[in-house]
Design a protein with these regions (language model features):
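A charged helix-plus-loop insertion that forms the helical arch/lid used to bind
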Residues: 80-93
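Active-site glycine-centered loops adjacent to acidic/histidine catalytic or metal-binding residues
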Residues: 113, 139, 307
């Protein structure tokens, strides 16, 4: 392998994904293992992580340009590690950069997971060529990343705000962070399963509802995911006025519902703000071209791919 290669890893709530990635966003080698880490087991988790990293480095004789790491959480201003890591609380306050540097002596880039997803989609997927691009990551949690002229928009903790907690239904269902009626509580996995319990009369996991809606063989699942799409269109109508993206990409496990989700999202978005965006596009003199909403082009390794983008494009 003579081309530049980077190693990326994505620490998820249930699974940690590790891969060798080239500058074209292709994953050349991949492995994963269960995250399962508590404060008492942090050392064993880090040992496992470093062993898996070394195993991939050995495949290319250690000839990589650097290591990119991503996780769900806020990164400190010095970019040394998470000061708040929602899916792995044991990582709070850990200087991950120093640990990786001491172990592997390679350049290290840390990025929060929504910006990793957004950078991957912007660089290699449906966001290519757009000046202002938004990516809505839809899973257990919900968050949006924004790219402005090639750079991720970063506020507190390296994120473009905590957009998943925008209130859609005041006094509505409570999310895991205590917000009442926020987008995450309505659109995320908990919202899907809550609707499932109401409409099926018994518990059904979100992944099954999503799969059935995509395959088109379950009217209840289709109805649930259509409602999720309507909520999504409502959220994006508000966010689009703040960030004025030219394209919005839906990514994550919930977006795998496909056409039923996308159609309902576009329907609600168009009904609420379609005329606004067309009007501004018409009179902007080419500065703004309007907005369209699409499904992600990338698969479930988006996080680790996005973790290394800045190594190839510093």
């Amino acid at each position: 392998m003579n081309e530049p290669i980077a190693l990326g890893f994505d620490i998820g709530g249930s699974k940690t994904k590790i891969g060798l990635v080239n500058r074209y966003g292709e994953v050349l080698a991949y492995n994963d293992f269960p995250t399962e880490v508590q404060a008492a087991s942090l050392d064993s988790f880090l040992r496992k992580l470093f062993e898996e990293i070394q195993a991939l480095l050995d495949l290319v004789d250690g000839k990589v340009i650097g290591i990119g790491a991503t996780f769900l959480g806020w990164i400190d201003d010095a970019r040394t590690g998470p000061f708040l890591c929602m899916n792995v609380p044991a990582l709070h306050g850990i200087n991950l950069r120093a640990l990786l540097d001491a172990e592997f002596h390679l350049p290290v880039v840390l990025i929060d997971d929504i910006n990793a997803h957004t950078l991957a989609e912007y660089t290699y997927g449906s966001g290519q060529g757009y000046r202002r691009f938004m990516c809505l990551a839809m899973g257990t949690g919900l968050s949006a990343g924004v790219i402005i002229h090639g750079k991720p928009l970063q506020f507190t903790g390296g994120c473009a705000g905590d957009t998943g907690h925008v209130i859609l239904r005041p006094g509505g269902p409570v999310c895991s962070a205590g917000c009442k009626g926020c987008a995450e509580a309505l659109i995320g996995v908990a919202g899907i399963e809550r609707q499932g319990l109401e409409k099926y009369g018994s518990y059904k996991p979100a992944y099954e509802i999503i799969k059935n809606a995509r395959e088109g063989n379950d009217p209840i699942a289709i109805d649930i995911m259509r409602q999720i799409g309507l909520y999504t269109g409502e959220l994006l109508a508000s966010l689009s006025h703040i960030f004025l993206p030219e394209r919005i990409s839906l990514t994550g496990g919930i977006a795998k519902a496909g056409k039923v989700l996308l159609d309902a999202t576009n329907e609600q978005f168009e009904q609420l703000v379609g005329d606004y965006h067309r009007l501004y596009a018409k009179f902007s003199g080419g500065y703004y071209s309007g907005v369209d909403i699409v499904l992600s082009k990338l698969e479930d390794k988006t996080g680790l791919i996005g973790a290394v983008v800045q190594l190839f494009n510093p």
